[in-house]
């Protein structure tokens, strides 16, 4: 009995379950102060490494079984040491890979938290000025980016997979984007106006006018077009532009008046309702007694009538010509008023009347001199011959039927009778000015027979001729210087010249 108890007491400490209550004082890295126990990660890591090594060994064993067996047969001690070194190297590589994987997972989790905070900050800053929604699906913001040397180093170390600090990188990203605001497309125009003191459109129009003047002078167009023609065209162009300008101004004014009338009118609902005969009679009596327009009529008139119809072109044209005359006079009168106010403010009242008379005389003299200086070149220009006045006048008036001739229809005197003074006999034919070689001569006709007295001959076209009056005969007679045959004896006969004796006159 005593022997049995001794054996039981001896075996009781040996039997029992293994627990993790034991604390290794030499391994403080794996000690968990919160739980007061040792961590199990090293054992898990060793187990994983053991299994990984075992797997690699099994793979090597399956890949090269024959080679391993031969090496074990030849040198068993060397084979064991070589395998140990190989397994040890693989174990170290696996430990390094495991640590690298853990470090990457840890850094990945930290970087995700950093970027979540960074994106959250962007949304908060953009939400202060408005985020996109259904009515405004796209938003354009402006922000400033700020960098320092420390921020740049942290960001570069993070991108290069180096050692980086979570807090430093978070502060760097949080301080990068500042001053969120909406993008303004016309901000550059304001900066331009602040820098140069002029609007962009005004500067563009000024440059365009300067370029037009340079082109006008450089291409010598002004030498071919007169100044009065250019001034006339400029006035016409200004009138056309002013017409469109004034029409747009009147349209805007009419539109503003219409909107003001619509804003003043109230109780629109009663205009769409039907009224009884008593209400209609009451409204008619009210309008007849007070001479006020019907508010519903004013409402529908303002609602239906377009402002475009309220501004006809004649109204814009009348305003254009009115402004063309009155606007310069307004500015001239304003300038004269300011001049007289400044001039007469320091002059006593007694001397103001002579000063005004003197100024009036000076103005009259100035306008007279200016008018004379302007009209003298105009009159000189009118006296000068221009391109349209250089056409030479004809030497003699031309006739439409130059090549048509008229035969002499007068009857020659009978034998033994002298011709009368008003008769012209055997006058040589007058050759036309343009007929030098005689190509336009009419056909020769036989002299008139005395028996044909009283007959009227015709020209080559067969049309009857009319006898010319005495004045034309007289002028022809004087121009020929009495070239008549000698008729002293009664028996003298008219001599036939070398040319035909038939009298031919140019038709009128």
From Swiss-Prot:
Record family assignment: Belongs to the chloride channel MCLC family.
InterPro entries: Chloride_chnl_CLIC-like (IPR009231)
Transmembrane region(s): 198-218, 235-255, 347-367
Membrane-topology descriptor: Multi-pass membrane protein
Region described as Disordered: 388-508
GO MF annotations, alphabetized: chloride channel activity
Chain's role: Seems to act as a chloride ion channel. Plays a role in retina development.
Protein name: Chloride channel CLIC-like protein 1
GO CC annotation: chloride channel complex; endoplasmic reticulum; endoplasmic reticulum membrane; Golgi membrane; membrane; mitochondria-associated endoplasmic reticulum membrane contact site; nuclear membrane
Predominant location: endoplasmic reticulum
Disulfide bond residue pairs: none
Keywords per UniProt: Chloride, Chloride channel, Endoplasmic reticulum, Golgi apparatus, Ion channel, Ion transport, Membrane, Nucleus, Signal, Transmembrane, Transmembrane helix, Transport
UniProt subcellular location: Endoplasmic reticulum membrane; Golgi apparatus membrane; Nucleus membrane
Start-end of Basic and acidic residues biased regions: 467-499
Presence of keyword Cell wall biogenesis/degradation: no
Signal peptide annotation: 1-16
Biased composition (Polar residues): 452-462
Nucleus is among the record's keywords: yes
